Amino acid sequence: MAYNYLKNLVIPRLIVKHQFKLRSFSTKSLNDTKEKAPSALIPVGLLVKPTMLSEVQKPTLWEKLTKPASTSSPEQRQKELLNEMKRSTIQDFNEVRRFNGKLFYSPPRLFKEKSALWMYNFHGKSLRNQYKELYKDWQGSPFFFALFSNAFGENQCRNWIQHLAPFDYLPVRYANVQSNLIKYWLQKIFIGKVKRSIPEKCWNEYITAYDNKFSFPEIGWNNKLVGNVYLIDDSCKIRWLGTGDPTNVEIENLKTAIKFLVNKNVG
């Protein structure tokens, strides 16, 4: 029941900032506060290409010994973390209600290659228990990327993926990113259920990752209650993105974008 309520019920901190305010949960409030989400018309992503983990230099013993100690106590850090998590969850839920589960509408066409920005270097264990790193293992050819942190967001991503049947040559990759260690380990425990939900041929394309960030505004994933999808080019730049459940117009724009991106890459 909670799932159905959430589905019928998002503001992109990506484009518009608003003052946080708790809202009434009445039906009247829902109808009165519905707004049309903006379109993602400018490139999103990181300005600098991430360094692959194998190239990151580990700190030396001297650097570890001379690193300044934290001035806050473990209890204080824990309290700050819990407060941040609480604010993030409440704000995310209010955003889902405000825009009916849609952070933004997809761009009508691909972002130009020269202005496109970089995707995060997500990494984790695949369903085949193999370690995967986005830039190390998936760079080199275009792919469709689904990003989510819960079943609701994953189902939204699947609503996009079901329209990709004519493009079976385009790899589909999944990242289930958790910012909570308990949820991360629960995902690992119930991994069998996840395996049953996707074809076996995709098991090595699905990773479960841990990252303690509560949002990724640089790539337009400001609300982890919903799922985001991306078209990633051969250099791991974000050329197109979507969120929530797709509209018919967005699906047609996605199909056109895939044809253009793949044909250019082949050519």
From Swiss-Prot:
Give a GO molecular function annotation for the protein: unfolded protein binding
Does the keyword Ribonucleoprotein belong to this entry? no
Q: Quote the InterPro entries the UniProt record gives.
A: ATP10
Question: Which keywords fit this entry according to its UniProt record?
Answer: Membrane, Mitochondrion, Mitochondrion inner membrane
Report the GO terms under cellular component. mitochondrial inner membrane; mitochondrion
Q: Name one Pfam family in it.
A: ATP-synt_10
An example GO biological process term is: mitochondrial proton-transporting ATP synthase complex assembly
Disulphide bridges in this chain? none
Tell me where in or outside the cell this protein is found: Mitochondrion inner membrane
Q: What does this protein do?
A: Involved in assembly of the mitochondrial F1-F0 complex.
Q: Which family does it belong to?
A: Belongs to the ATP10 family.
Write the protein's name: Probable mitochondrial ATPase complex subunit atp10
What would be the name of the gene that encodes this protein? atp10
